[in-house]
Regions:
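A bilobed periplasmic-binding-protein/Venus flytrap-type ligand-binding module shared by bacterial periplasmic
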Residues: 155-162, 197-202, 275-290, 307-310
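Mature extracytoplasmic/periplasmic domains
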Residues: 45, 282-346
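Extracytoplasmic ligand-binding site segments that recognize negatively charged/polar headgroups
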Residues: 58-65, 102-104, 109-240
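N-terminal secretory signal peptides
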Residues: 1-21, 25, 32
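Conserved C-terminal helix/tail region of periplasmic/extracytoplasmic solute-binding proteins
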Residues: 15-17, 338-369
Length: 369
């Protein structure tokens, strides 16, 4: 199952292959995500303490060094930062910690994993005497066992050629009479069941805990009119080809569809599911407290977060970033105040406590079990 972070890398490479950006811009944008490959440094750097960041895909260490490592190392000359692009899934983090062979210091993860792994005692708590809580817009982005330098959303995308008066809510998404045609959902319960619950009329401020039985039954109602995606590129393709007339996609893919189709494919922020791009530190990480200093630097870099929004669409989480966002990008920013106001902040704690069981039930249902 492809993660959001992996899809960000793939999306950048697609734009590069289409000639929509040059190599320098590609490297700069990937650096905003902290994406790169670990490489040997100069002999003089060997005496420095190394911080290893694990991400979901990588190209070159030089780009990461230029945009994240160099500013951090300039302020902290005793450290160097390298990348490991080995995909830090919850399972891999758990295996590392339980085996006592931890090689990662900071991992691009999720709120669900932060609560799940943190509850198992496998993560270091964030040291908020080092990491400034005021550098994020709210508690969703600053958790006990992780903090978020970016955000993303699950949103409703539709074909306006088929539906000039398009759907305005998840209730409309489930209304096959008014909006006939095949729907598209992710082959994963997170986001999907949140939307199913909203389609039943549950207010956003009382969405959690989810009524799992009711949400699963709601998906089952339209099962014969559903197709499922496992990667961002696949979700985009389902919509482009018309195999699905509407779907739930990551907002970054929704942006590509809307801009490249000149508005034929549209998306709405209403009832979007806003999620933090959480970074976590495995218990027993080699660099120890230094990982907290790097995390603090990432959250403080509002200008870099805005550049990431411009490049990929990932939303900034630093409150200072809002005033820096160019007007033409506000439409696509999940944390733009007007956009965030009509979304629901996904409850990572609930998902962390329930994901394994609920997702297994969901997969069993959608695969015909």
């Amino acid at each position: 199952m492809q993660s959001f972070q992996q899809d960000c890398v793939e999306l950048a490479l697609e734009k590069f292959r289409r000639g929509e950006m040059d190599r320098r811009t590609l490297l700069a944008g990937l650096a905003m995500l902290g994406v790169g490959a670990g490489a040997a440094q100069q002999a003089a750097a060997q005496a420095q303490q190394t911080i290893v960041m694990a991400n979901w895909g990588g190209l070159v260490n030089q780009a990461f060094t230029r945009y994240y490592a160099e500013p951090f190392m300039a302020a902290n000359p005793g450290f160097r930062v390298v990348q490991d692009s080995a995909s830090p899934s919850a399972g891999r983090i758990r295996s590392m910690v339980e085996s006592g062979r931890v090689t990662w210091d900071l991992c691009d993860s999720s709120a669900t994993s932060a609560f799940m792994l943190g509850g198992m005692g496998l993560l270091n708590p964030v040291d908020y005497s080092v990491v400034n809580r005021e550098n994020v817009t709210g508690p969703t982005f600053a958790l006990e066992h992780g903090a978020a330098p970016y955000s993303y959303s699950n949103v409703l995308v539709y074909d306006s050629r088929r539906f000039p008066e398009g759907p305005r809510s998840w209730a409309d998404f489930w209304d096959l009479r008014r909006f006939p045609g095949t729907r598209l959902l992710r082959r994963d319960a997170t986001g999907t069941l949140d939307a199913a619950q909203m389609s039943l009329g549950t207010p956003l401020d009382s969405l959690y805990p989810l009524d799992v039985r009711a949400a699963l039954a709601r998906v089952r109602e339209i099962r014969r009119n559903l197709v499922f995606w496992t990667s961002g590129a696949e979700s985009e393709q389902f919509i482009r080809t018309g195999e699905a007339v509407m779907g739930q996609l990551w907002h970054t893919r929704a942006k590509v569809l809307e801009t490249e189709s000149n508005g034929r494919f549209k998306f709405i922020w209403n009832q979007g599911i806003l999620q933090p791009g959480i970074f976590v530190s495995p218990r027993g990480n080699p660099a120890g407290p230094a990982a907290q200093r790097l995390l603090a630097s990432m959250l403080a870099g509002a200008e870099y977060q805005v550049r990431l929004l411009q490049f990929f669409g990932n939303g900034p989480t630093n409150p200072r970033a809002a005033a820096m966002v160019p007007a033409e990008f506000r439409r696509f920013n999940p944390t733009e105040p007007a956009n965030a106001a009509v979304q629901v902040a996904q409850n990572g704690r609930w998902w962390g406590e329930n994901y394994a069981r609920v997702n297994a039930e969901y997969i069993d249902m959608v695969t015909g079990g």
